[in-house]
C-alpha cells in the first residue's frame, strides 16, 4: 500500500492564504510587511531561488525588494548593504541568498543582520532564543517541517523522531523544535548523520524519520519502520528530474511521505513569509 502524501504544496498554499489576510490588516494600519533579499554574484540558481521567494511574497501581498551586488563585491560592500537594510524602517525581513561568491564570509554577513529582521533564523541571538525555548524566528525549513506534520495530523507527541542530518538549517534546529515541550512536538529525538555507525538500526526505530543528509536516495526501504512518517528534505538534480534523500521504494513501506518536489520546499518558502509577517507584527 502506497504511503499517504504529505502535501507541502497544498499546506503552503493554505498558509499563504492565511498570511494574505493578516498582511491586509497590517497594511491597512500602515505597516505592510516587506522582505528584502541581498543577492551577490551571478549564480543562476540563486537568482531563480530569490525570484521564486519574491513571487510568493507578492502573491500574499508582502512587499519585496532585491539588492543585487556584482560578483566582484567585497565583504565590506555586502556588510554595507545589510546595514542599510537594517536601518530601513520599511523593511521587516532580510535574507542573504547563499552561497556567496568565494572569498566572502557568510557567517559574518549573517551575524550582521538585525536579529529582529533575521527571518532565516540564523543569527546567533535567534539560535540562542530557540535553544532557550523562547524562539523569535526558527530556520524556515525546520519550522516548516514541524508545521507540515502538525497540519497533516502526523502524531509527533510521544513519538520517536529520528533526524538524519546535523546541519544548522535543518537537523539541529529541528531536533530542538521536535523535542520541545509544546503542542505538535514533545518527541524523543535521535540526531544522526552520515558518520553514524549502524545508521539503519536507528532509522528503523523511527515513528517520524527526517532525511536531511544531502545524499540522493540515502534512505532505502530496508531502513524504514513500516508505517512511519518520512520527511524528505533532499533536493538533487538527476538529469531532468529532481530527487530527494529518500529512495523511491520507501513509498511502499512508509505510512506517510513528503514528495520531492512539492513537499518540504514549498513549506520552507511559506515559513519565510510567515517569519516576515511576524517581524512586521513586532512593535
Where are these regions (language model features)?
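Short glycine-rich anion-binding loops that position phosphate/pyrophosphate groups of nucleotides
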Residues: 97-103, 169, 215-217, 235-236, ...
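Glycine-rich phosphate/diphosphate-binding loop of Rossmann-like nucleotide-binding domains
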Residues: 40, 45-54, 135-229, 238-251
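N-terminal glycine-rich anion-binding loops that anchor highly charged ligand groups
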Residues: 25-35, 41-59
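Positively charged, low-complexity intrinsically disordered leader regions
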Residues: 1-31
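Anion-binding alpha/beta catalytic cores of soluble intermediary-metabolism enzymes, centered on
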Residues: 93-161, 202
Amino acid at each position: 500500500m502506497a504511503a499517504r502524501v504529505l502535501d507541502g504544496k497544498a499546506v503552503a498554499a493554505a498558509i499563504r492564504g492565511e498570511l494574505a489576510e493578516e498582511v491586509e490588516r497590517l497594511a491597512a494600519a500602515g505597516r505592510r510587511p516587506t522582505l528584502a533579499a541581498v543577492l551577490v554574484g551571478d549564480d543562476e540558481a540563486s537568482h531563480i531561488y530569490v525570484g521564486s521567494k519574491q513571487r510568493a511574497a507578492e502573491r500574499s501581498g508582502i512587499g519585496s525588494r532585491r539588492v543585487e551586488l556584482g560578483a566582484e563585491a567585497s565583504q565590506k560592500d555586502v556588510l554595507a548593504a545589510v546595514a542599510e537594510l537594517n536601518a530601513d524602517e520599511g523593511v521587516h525581513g532580510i535574507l542573504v541568498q547563499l552561497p556567496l561568491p568565494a572569498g566572502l564570509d557568510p557567517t559574518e554577513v549573517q551575524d550582521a543582520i538585525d536579529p529582529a529582521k533575521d527571518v532565516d533564523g540564523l543569527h546567533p541571538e535567534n539560535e540562542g532564543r530557540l535553544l532557550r525555548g523562547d524562539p523569535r524566528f526558527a530556520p524556515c525549513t525546520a519550522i516548516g517541517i514541524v508545521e507540515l506534520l502538525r497540519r497533516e495530523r502526523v502524531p509527533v507527541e510521544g513519538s520517536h523522531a529520528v533526524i538524519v542530518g546535523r546541519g544548522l538549517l535543518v537537523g539541529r534546529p529541528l531536533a530542538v523544535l521536535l523535542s520541545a515541550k509544546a503542542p505538535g512536538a514533545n518527541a524523543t529525538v535521535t540526531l544522526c548523520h552520515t558518520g553514524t555507525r549502524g545508521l539503519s538500526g536507528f532509522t528503523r526505530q523511527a515513528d517520524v524519520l527526517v532525511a536531511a543528509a544531502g545524499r540522493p536516495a540515502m534512505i532505502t526501504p530496508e531502513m524504514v519502520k513500516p508505517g512511519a512518517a518520512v520527511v524528505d528534505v533532499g533536493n538533487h538534480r538527476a538529469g531532468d528530474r529532481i530527487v530527494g534523500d529518500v529512495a523511491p521504494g520507501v513509498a511502499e513501506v512508509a505510512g506517510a511521505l513528503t514528495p520531492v518536489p512539492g513537499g518540504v520546499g514549498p513549506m520552507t518558502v511559506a515559513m519565510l513569509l510567515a517569519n516576515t509577517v511576524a517581524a512586521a507584527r513586532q512593535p
